[in-house]
Amino acid sequence: MILDIAREVSVVMRQAGVNGAVIGGVAVVLHGHIRTTVDVDVFVPDPPERLADALRAGGFAFDAGKKEFSKSGVPVHLVLVDQVRRPPIERIELEGVTTVSLADLVDMKLRTGSSDPLRAQDLADVIGLIRHHQLRRDFARNLGADVRGEFKKLVDAIERG
């Protein structure tokens, strides 16, 4: 169900000409680390109004109190450019969903997980992705300079077992 909603959001983005991407837990699952998620997070680099209008036209309901869209009971959150520390660079298509590259996803998760102790799930996601893809220290070259050290520490800890 959630993956179907992510696909619908991707279609709406393409049709509206929005260069957005599904991020968060859905992106983690698409990149191979199996875990549960209850919502669809969408990075929106453009002013959000165009995507918001397109989502409404596509049958997504907007709850002003929660500041989220939903369809079939699945919440859809728009993540604006000023809410991320480093906007993702590369968009890719996985299972019919427009998402971010593995490097961008790991970078985003490291930034939120390292800076907010209440976001431990983000670091758990990075660990899961490192294990699934058998990433090594040299993968850090694909990340922002300010998170490379944290990534290498996680790889080292995983390799020590």
Language-model-detected regions and their locations in the chain:
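Compositionally biased terminal segments of proteins
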Residues: M1-G161
